[in-house]
Amino acid sequence: MPTIMSAVVLLSGGLDSATVLRMAHATGQRIHALSFRYGQRHTMELEMARKQALSLPGVAHRIMDLQLSLFGGSALTADIPVPKGGVDENTIPVTYVPARNMVFLSLALAWAESLGAQHLYIGVNAVDYSGYPDCRPEFIQSFQQTANLATKAGVEGHPFTVHTPLINLTKAQIIQQGLALGVDYGLTRSCYDPDAQGAGCGLCDACRLRLQGFAEAGVPDPAPYQGP
């Protein structure tokens, strides 16, 4: 009987990571999904991550507590206003969480090595994104090289691969591929500054990119938004 490969998928509960979860699951690998409670103000996404994991058979899901809010430095984890009027494309926005993807991937790598898994999946995107440095292809390439230099598995000839299936897709293309795979986008949240019920503000950069993506895909966004 052939050995079933295993993979660790970073699952935030947002649109992109829910799509990546389905993509990874479709490969037939044994999927381990990892989410983080890191002090973010948009914690509703963790409930969405739980529901996304439960929607697929055989997915093991863990939520790890990691208080990046202790460091501050981001509008997502500190008392800093979330921009609502667009962002300057020439600067890194205040919604950037210092080294977040480096931290998340490092922990996913540690779990993968303990599981004997050689595949990591992350929903970074370099097309419709907000200018975060840890969403670029060069960062992913560098991390994969580091992963294989820094681990027992890597030096013993069992290298890791970091998969970024969304890296060159527009938000509309991501949505179209996700719908084809059966993603329920009503069970995802993207807003940086939602209300207490998890409804999106419709004005932050995450909401703007999401709404634009659904409009370009020609389908309505099923997530709730604040309004009169």
Curated annotation (Swiss-Prot):
Q: According to the record, how does the cofactor bind? A: Binds 1 zinc ion per subunit.
Does RNA-binding appear among the keywords? no
Q: Which residues bind ATP?
A: L11, S12, G13, G14, L15, D16, S17, A18, T19, V20, L21
Recorded catalytic activity of this chain's protein: 7-carboxy-7-deazaguanine + NH4(+) + ATP = 7-cyano-7-deazaguanine + ADP + phosphate + H2O + H(+)
Q: Which residues bind Zn(2+)?
A: C191, C201, C204, C207
GO terms for biological process, alphabetical: queuosine biosynthetic process
Which keywords describe this protein according to UniProt?
ATP-binding, Ligase, Metal-binding, Nucleotide-binding, Queuosine biosynthesis, Zinc
User: Where exactly are the transmembrane stretches of this chain?
Assistant: none
Give the cofactors, semicolon-separated.
Zn(2+)
Gene Ontology MF, one: zinc ion binding
Cite the EC number: 6.3.4.20
The disulfide bridges present are none
Function of the molecule: Catalyzes the ATP-dependent conversion of 7-carboxy-7-deazaguanine (CDG) to 7-cyano-7-deazaguanine (preQ(0)).
Family indicated by similarity = Belongs to the QueC family.
* Protein name stated in the entry: 7-cyano-7-deazaguanine synthase
Originating organism: Magnetococcus marinus (strain ATCC BAA-1437 / JCM 17883 / MC-1)
